């Protein structure tokens, strides 16, 4: 059996301009023996999509997510956000795009332990500097309440369960009304019940809030319930399958 990577044509995105595009994106890790983390990635993700990125360990899932989220730069190729070529931006412009266009949720919540939940959710809004203090507090409180944490806003992260902390991370990711949420193994450190709750929360972000969610996951059962699954092997896309489960 051949080990050649098949050429995969990504599904056509409905709409005018895709939210996120990758054109021939390759990321080489330099060293004595250079390593390709991802290679020749071509994809388009549109509005209101719920996308899984799957594959075995070391296949490049997180590397691809970080490139799409401007947390890393490709060695070659281009990443576009809503038609804007981020390769033509300086770091200040890319940071602004990360802050306004994207939200992030990771396997470990990265909440600041000395801050209350309210203050943690306000952090992206403070960095952007568009809202008054009272408006930031109101929005943070509304986000936490919408995720079932209205009675916990003045608690600190260590007073919550793992699933509750991930809810706070989702609220923080939504703080600046991004177009897309990028999630790296958001249920990876949770038990099955908490994993299901976080999954349903992310699905609600798509179906109720109209956002796009792209999530790296090892959980095949969760990936099967998403709109689309992008499968990686050895840093390349081997399948890009629409699940038609909207």
Positions of the model-derived regions?
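H-loop (His-switch) and adjacent beta-strand-loop-beta switch element
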Residues: 226-242
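ABC-family P-loop ATPase nucleotide-binding domain
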Residues: 1-28, 239-246
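ABC family nucleotide-binding domain
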Residues: 18-225, 229
């Amino acid at each position: 059996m051949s080990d050649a990577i098949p050429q995969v044509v990504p599904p056509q995105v409905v709409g005018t301009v895709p939210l996120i595009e990758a054109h021939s994106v390759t990321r080489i890790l330099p060293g004595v023996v250079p390593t390709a983390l991802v290679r020749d990635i071509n994809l388009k993700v549109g509005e209101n999509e719920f996308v899984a990125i799957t594959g075995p360990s070391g296949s490049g899932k997180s590397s691809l997510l970080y490139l799409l989220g401007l947390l890393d730069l490709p060695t070659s190729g281009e990443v576009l956000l809503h038609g804007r070529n981020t390769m033509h931006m300086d770091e200040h412009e890319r940071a602004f795009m990360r802050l306004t266009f994207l939200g992030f949720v990771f396997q470990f919540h990265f909440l600041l332990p000395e801050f209350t939940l309210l203050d943690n959710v306000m952090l992206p809004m403070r960095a952007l500097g568009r809202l008054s203090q009272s408006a930031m507090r109101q929005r943070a409180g509304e986000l936490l309440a919408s995720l079932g944490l209205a009675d916990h806003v003045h608690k600190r992260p260590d007073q919550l369960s793992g699933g509750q902390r991930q809810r706070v991370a989702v609220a923080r990711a939504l703080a600046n009304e991004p177009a897309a949420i990028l999630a790296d193994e958001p249920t990876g450190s949770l038990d099955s019940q908490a994993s299901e709750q976080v999954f349903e929360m992310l699905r609600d972000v798509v179906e109720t809030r109209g956002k796009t969610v792209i999530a790296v996951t090892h959980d095949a059962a969760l990936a099967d319930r998403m709109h689309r699954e992008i499968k990686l092997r050895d840093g390349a896309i081997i399948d890009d399958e629409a699940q038609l489960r909207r």
